[in-house]
Amino acid sequence: MQLNTRQARIFKLANLLGTGKPVSAADIITSLECSEPTLTRALKELRESYSAEIKYSKAGHSYHLVNPGQLDKKTLRRMNEALAQNAELKTGESTGKVVLDKDKKTAVSLSLRMRILRKIDRLAALSGSTRSEAVEKLALHSVDELIKEYSAKKS
């Protein structure tokens, strides 16, 4: 099962605090790669979801799991296994790039006879595309042909 970012963060936090020793806030933030407000939300979720009692020490600027609630050794082990599986899934994923850039298009106004417009609409219907896509295909094909024709005449 693949974990979402929030789940992975909470599982990591549970494992960090599961040792029973105080853990500094800086170490937790570094390990979870998150901000202080995000850490606060993750601690709240851990307290609420697992009935865990987590104390904050101002002197040491650290957190300590005082009462684990439902975070017993078995639950922590399962969380650790889920994190390991999640890490394996992430390394196995393809690292191909996705390009989300669109071709830059410019709106063009054309004055066409109805006969030509009906032919363009028919081409769009036959090719399963929009009128704009049909005009683009038509223009691309025709312009390429005309360029070849005029290039041949000049040579």
From Swiss-Prot:
It comes from Escherichia coli. The keyword Transcription applies. The gene is terW. GO terms for molecular function: DNA binding. Keywords: DNA-binding, Plasmid, Tellurium resistance, Transcription, Transcription regulation. Induction: Expression is not influenced by the presence of potassium tellurite or hydrogen peroxide. GO terms for biological process: response to tellurium ion. Involved in tellurite resistance. TerW binds specifically to the potential promoter region of the terZABCDE operon and probably regulates expression of the genes. InterPro entries: TerW, WH-like_DNA-bd_sf. The keyword Transcription applies. This is Probable tellurium resistance transcriptional regulator TerW.
